[in-house]
Amino acid sequence: IEGYIIILVSHKLDEVFELCKEATILKNGSKIKTIPIPFERKKIVDLMFKGDKSIDKIKNPISRIKRENMHIDLKYYKKGIAKIPEGKKIGVIGLQGSGNDQFIKKIFDKSISISRKINKNRIMIDKKNIYYTPSDRLEKGLFSDLTLIEHMALSENKNNFINWKKIKEYSRKKINEFNIKGTLNSQAKELSGGNQQKLQLSLIPNEKGLLAIEQPTRGLDLNSTQSVWNKINERIKDDICLFFSTTDIDEVWDQSDWIISFSGENITDISEKKDIKKSDIKFFISGIKTR
């Protein structure tokens, strides 16, 4: 359009190359570099992830205990059956809006079906055993105006009557166990992001299940991030498995046993962490490399 400047915000390299004459690369709110288009794609990806730790060392050792494989039906993505052992942490990584958060939602709404082997029979995991926490903590995960004790009452109430004495004791125990910085009467909207996330985790039933967590540490400071992962890692020892989405390469590398990479709402790679290098991930999520 003559006389106008159009600013396109995108994470899709194909789109930028097709529509733009130059591109400015941003990361965490800071300008990295402005470049002319066309430009070598590999160099753009390197600039996009400049400053990420490049150590390939695996931080969380993979358990050598043999577990039965889960079967993850990926026909929605025109893939076959992915086989991953139970008890694993599966990180689902992609740039913002690439489809990795939607993957977690699809596990919860059963668009992606997962089965496990019990007594030689393959059984589908029931929705009641899938414990989902959304990334929009106040919008979708919690009731902003309800207090901590009211959240606990809704979570624990198994019938039409609430025993407030028991709920008060239970709530105090959970607040202490998850180190939530708030009182029984604190509203969810009054909590920090880290404490809102810990409140979400505290509401997950104690029964064994499959954890499906969107962006577990988005927007959290270092201490809150570590605290949240400590609670998740305590829990996963006894659960079926954990699926979590993230846009952070360091987080997916540090916390995953298996990694599913997304670009443009498509799966570009599914690998056990020991079979790839950390440096591969940036190319998987930018769509430059697939397997």
Labelled PLM ranges:
Residues 1-291:
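Glycine-rich phosphate-binding loops of nucleotide-dependent enzymes
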